[in-house]
């Protein structure tokens, strides 16, 4: 294929589960100088919900103070909370880095990802297929999708036919749900426009901004010229405004995967090794693209339906693939896998280091910079080595690498030497 493929991959949702080392009500952030919007009511699981704002825009949403905690016979740990990046924050240059710093600086103990949405915006598929025609072929039964049997469709029923603009595969309880829809159409709906998404499109050369004019009729019957903007094919925008009716807006489509917490374990289809989905896996565009392709390999897999000589439908494993996205030959296929949730004791060295790091974080005798370092090490420890909750066989396959353990212990030794230099004991 000689044509250039323009596409834009992004986070669209990121939510994590944490535990507070100290209570963090909305007044804590207000006293630090943040603008905070507190909701008058909580959620079915949490008493308190508030949003931290920056320059009037939502930054991070916090849900805390659970109704049912384990100390009172409930299901949540004491201090449990959920943190979520706002949709606008997901489109920052480094949203995961910002999220990490927020978790560390404000004393949250990271436990794991509860939901992450990864999306790709594009004009056409990698071999030039029109997304609208792909939806039409799917609804007409010319192609079929592997996995995720539940499907929901949205479109319009017109005299000359039905036109589909959105499909969703998977159920509310699925580990992964898949969506394909016309993102331009969604943003054009009143009250749904998101300028930061359109800015990303321009940076990725999916479209260009065209200033337009249109006639507006006032309440007194007089008319005036007003200005607006449309998004046209990249490089075709004119410097001067043009009438709105002469502007042909380019449709940009989106494929989106929503991954829930029970899909946090991934298996390498070649080596059969298990890997944990963490913030480290989604902190760059290239990592997001790799994860998107892994998901697409399993959850956006289509077959072209063919028939036998007798006129019966051919078995799906004998039908040819309908390839939509091109992936590198160097990329390895990973598949989400739900693992048993039975508790398994962590290795003893992890428990010892974790307990001492917690004491460092909560001790009043420890300087702030050392407590922050301890919290950072603790986050990294749980990011790389949180293995309990898997079966014995799986834990043997997904064994600790010596490098990870050595690096973490070396950081811990440096921290202990800093304490000894200050003659602090804990």
What are these regions (language model features)?
Residues 1-340, 349-426:
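Structured, helix-rich domain cores that form ligand/interaction pockets
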């Amino acid at each position: 294929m000689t044509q250039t493929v323009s596409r834009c991959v992004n986070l669209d949702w990121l939510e994590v589960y944490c535990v507070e080392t100290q209570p963090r009500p909305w007044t804590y952030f207000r006293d630090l100088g943040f603008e905070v919007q507190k909701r008058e009511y909580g959620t079915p699981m949490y008493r308190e919900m508030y949003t931290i704002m920056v320059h009037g825009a939502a930054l991070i949403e916090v849900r805390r103070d659970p109704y049912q905690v384990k100390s009172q016979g409930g299901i949540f740990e004491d201090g449990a909370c959920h943190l979520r990046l706002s949709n606008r924050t997901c489109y920052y240059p480094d949203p995961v880095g910002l999220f990490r710093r927020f978790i560390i600086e404000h004393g949250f103990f990271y436990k794991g990802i509860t939901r992450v949405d990864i999306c790709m915006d594009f004009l056409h598929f990698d071999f030039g297929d029109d997304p609208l025609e792909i939806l039409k072929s799917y609804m007409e039964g010319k192609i079929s999708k592997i996995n995720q049997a539940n499907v929901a469709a949205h479109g319009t029923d017109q005299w000359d036919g039905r036109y589909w603009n959105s499909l969703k595969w998977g159920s509310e309880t699925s580990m992964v749900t898949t969506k394909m829809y016309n993102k331009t159409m969604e943003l054009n709906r009143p009250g749904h426009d998101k300028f930061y998404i359109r800015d990303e499109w321009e940076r990725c050369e999916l479209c260009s901004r065209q200033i337009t004019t249109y006639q507006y009729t006032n309440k007194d019957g007089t008319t005036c010229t007003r200005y607006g903007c449309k998004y046209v094919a990249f490089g075709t925008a004119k410097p001067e405004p043009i009438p709105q009716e002469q502007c042909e807006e380019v449709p940009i489509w989106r494929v989106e995967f929503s991954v829930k917490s029970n899909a946090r374990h991934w298996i390498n289809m070649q080596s059969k090794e298990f890997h944990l989905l963490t913030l480290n896996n989604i902190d760059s565009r290239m990592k997001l693209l790799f994860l998107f392709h892994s998901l697409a390999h399993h959850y956006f897999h289509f077959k072209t339906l063919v028939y036998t000589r007798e006129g019966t439908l051919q078995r799906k494993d004998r039908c040819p693939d309908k390839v939509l996205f091109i992936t590198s030959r160097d990329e390895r296929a990973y598949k989400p896998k739900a693992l048993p949730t039975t508790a398994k004791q962590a290795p003893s060295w992890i428990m010892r280091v974790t307990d001492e790091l917690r004491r460092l974080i909560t001790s009043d005798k420890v300087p702030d910079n050392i407590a922050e370092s301890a919290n950072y090490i603790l986050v990294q420890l749980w990011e790389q080595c949180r293995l309990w909750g898997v079966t014995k066989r799986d834990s043997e396959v997904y064994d600790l690498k010596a490098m990870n353990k050595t690096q973490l212990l070396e950081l811990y030794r440096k921290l202990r030497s800093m304490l000894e230099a200050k003659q602090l004991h804990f």
